[in-house]
Amino acid sequence: NEVGIIYGNDSSSTAVIEAADLIRDKKDTMLVGSASIFQSMNSTVSMNLSVILKLKGINFTISGACASGSHAIGMGYLMIKQGLQDTIVCGGAQEINALSMGSFDGINAFSIREDSPTTASRPFDRDRDGLVPSGGGATVILESYESAKKRGAKIIAEVTGYGFASNGEHISIPNVEGPVRSLERALKDAKINPIEIDYLNAHATSTPVGDENEAKAIFKVFDKGIVPV
């Protein structure tokens, strides 16, 4: 069976800045080295993993801000559903460094509770004041039902629907209608009713506006019952 990889990655800034600094200092682009360009690309994560794991299937990276990893799973689901791949390694990975975090802080999204980092992130709390930056990665391997049964795999979950939408109004301030459309689209694709959902994994950035609008969207879609968030 052909195995592909679709990963989410928002940015890769360190290599770009380090290369620019080296060129500025040495006045010679040849001294940057051939590896720098591959480290600068968002697709460096899927390129490297495909070589390490010797994957021969679909291979690309999705960059969709905080939704990058979720979109990777959604696209993997669609590819398998359409019969284009049997198995896809899906997930997301993001580096953390002072260079990218410094510019990110320009939108005042970070909590200022520096003396208590473990309790600074307070999603949907009235005293929330922003998120805590971090880096890392996570993987979900998707496989067609037929492929999983054939190899005797233990099936632990099923992806039944995928939804997406853009708010189309502001580059950084979320609205309510965008999340509502994406939730409703996922439910429609899965052919299930909102009342059947018993758990919702929220974006929950702990920002004042973000959490407020997300909560409004959740209540608008799941107005027939309270869903654990």
Each model region followed by its residue ranges:
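A glycine- and small-aliphatic-rich helix-loop capping segment at beta-alpha/alpha-beta transitions
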Residues: 12-30, 79-82, 102-114, 177-178, ...
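Solvent-exposed alpha-helices and their adjacent loops that cap or buttress functional pockets
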Residues: 29-30, 38, 42, 53-56, ...
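Acyl-CoA/ACP chain-elongation machinery
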Residues: 84-129, 162-176, 202-212, 226-229
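Short acidic capping loops at alpha-helix termini that bridge into adjacent secondary structure
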Residues: 1-2, 86, 158, 193-198, ...
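Active-site-proximal alpha-helical scaffold in enzymes
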Residues: 42-45, 50-53, 58-93, 131-153
